[in-house]
Amino acid sequence: MLSAAEGILLSIATVEAGLGVLGNTFIALVNCMDWAKNNKLSMTGFLLIGLATSRIFIVWLLTLDAYAKLFYPSKYFSSSLIEIISYIWMTVNHLTVWFATSLSIFYFLKIANFSDCVFLWLKRRTDKAFVFLLGCLLTSWVISFSFVVKVMKDGKVNHRNRTSEMYWEKRQFTINYVFLNIGVISLFMMTLTACFLLIMSLWRHSRQMQSGVSGFRDLNTEAHVKAIKFLISFIILFVLYFIGVSIEIICIFIPENKLLFIFGFTTASIYPCCHSFILILSNSQLKQAFVKVLQGLKFF
């Protein structure tokens, strides 16, 4: 049985997960409908569909993992469920970060202004940048997958008092965890770099605008600010997600602390929930469709 605090926190996390599924499903449906209508899929549409779909899987995996650990711990650790979830989660997690990073790079190349020859070459050949990112994804996935296999083989299952708990030597587990996420961290660092360069581009553009009309904000400035807000929100929410997942994994060593585990689940669920609605509000097409849905609901 859960305590009152644990029950309340789990309810909050479940609501976050539900909103995350609804928000990301909406994003995927709107872009798929636009694809079917125009018989053409833009790069932004492709990235949004991929990001939304992968996040739906992430939410379901987080929820399934949390409920299985809380209510069926013996079956969870004694069966192959933990291995299945680990392999699927590792793959989907890489895809989610890759789509988010690719979207960040796309906004950066589209909006930023630099005279550097490498930047200008990438700006004209965006597809080359995505081929490079795809290579990074495949490389990091192969490395991470091999470490997941290693961790699962090294895991020792101990049956005591009808409870199955997986024990790993903590130092080795920490090393494995770092290597498991090295690809994700590398992609995340690309987003940080894109955000920093966008801020630099905005600063340079603002200095150039100082010679113009005072207080005038042109469309380029607005685009910079909008993209920077999007990137910063992703960075903050992804850090929360990473912290939440780390807390959940650490709780393997302290399975009796259910409150801490549920807190990790709640923290991790903030990212797919909140960022989906940030995407909806920051994208004009998604925002218009969302307003139409809200207006339609008023008639019921």
Curated annotation (Swiss-Prot):
The chain crosses the membrane at residues 8-28, 44-64, 88-108, 129-149, 182-202, 234-254, 260-280. Glycans are attached at residue 161. Keywords: G-protein coupled receptor, Glycoprotein, Membrane, Receptor, Sensory transduction, Taste, Transducer, Transmembrane, Transmembrane helix. Its main location: membrane. It comes from the Eukaryota. GO terms for biological process: sensory perception of bitter taste. Expressed in subsets of taste receptor cells of the tongue and palate epithelium and exclusively in gustducin-positive cells. Expressed in gastric and duodenal tissues. Several bitter taste receptors are expressed in a single taste receptor cell. This is Taste receptor type 2 member 105. It comes from Mus musculus. The gene is Tas2r105.
